[in-house]
Amino acid sequence: MKKKSSLSEEDQALFRQLMAGTRQIKQDTIVHRPPRKKISEVPVKRLIQEQADASHYFSDEFQPLLNTEGPVKYVRPDVSHFEAKKLRRGDYSPELFLDLHGLTQLQAKQELGALIATCRREHVFCACVMHGHGKHILKQQTPLWLAQHPHVMAFHQAPKEYGGDAALLVLIEVEEWLPPELP
């Protein structure tokens, strides 16, 4: 189907007359290159390996000594207890969130391992793990697993805005870790 021109025959003739003697410009200045692939993509094999490596830290048989009274909290022996206080007050805001709702214990361990590996790779030092209330299986196991991991510096029950007693704020040790300056 031929497109109708909105110009009158007179205007078309005038346009042709004015354009007589001109030639079409050859496009020779801009070269369109195909888009480059992102180099920062992490290979799938590496992600699977990180997940498997990180999940081997979590044992169901090992029971670390955690305080059962009050809010759930843990501070590694070489870390200041003030870090747990900062987590409780909400001085650290999590950059990554992990929701464990509906996962089995095995899946939850793998996801926790992947979260810690991702935090270390992306230099994220605070994450929120939402275990929920449910049947209290993940709520009881999550702190025990986190306390076993060598890169977990501290964790504390999350403030209300991040899930309250159904979540934990976790402080992860990354290379060259420096606490942020408080205003």
Curated annotation (Swiss-Prot):
Gene3D superfamilies assigned: 3.30.1370.110
GO biological process: rescue of stalled ribosome
Free-text function comment from the UniProt entry: Acts as a ribosome collision sensor. Detects stalled/collided disomes (pairs of ribosomes where the leading ribosome is stalled and a second ribosome has collided with it) and endonucleolytically cleaves mRNA at the 5' boundary of the stalled ribosome. Stalled/collided disomes form a new interface (primarily via the 30S subunits) that binds SmrB. Cleaved mRNA becomes available for tmRNA ligation, leading to ribosomal subunit dissociation and rescue of stalled ribosomes.
Keywords attached to this entry: Endonuclease, Hydrolase, Nuclease, RNA-binding, rRNA-binding
Location of the Smr domain: 98-173
One example GO MF annotation: rRNA binding
Pfam families the UniProt entry points to: Smr
Regions crossing the membrane: none
Organism: Escherichia fergusonii (strain ATCC 35469 / DSM 13698 / CCUG 18766 / IAM 14443 / JCM 21226 / LMG 7866 / NBRC 102419 / NCTC 12128 / CDC 0568-73)
UniProt family annotation: Belongs to the SmrB family.
Enzyme class, UniProt record, top EC level: hydrolase
InterPro entries named in the record: Smr_dom (IPR002625), Smr_dom_sf (IPR036063), SmrB-like (IPR022990)
Intrachain S-S bonds: none
KW Transport (keyword) present: no
Subunit structure: Associates with collided ribosomes, but not with correctly translating polysomes.
Protein name per Swiss-Prot or TrEMBL: Ribosome rescue factor SmrB
Enzyme Commission number, as recorded: 3.1.-.-
Heme found in the keyword field: no
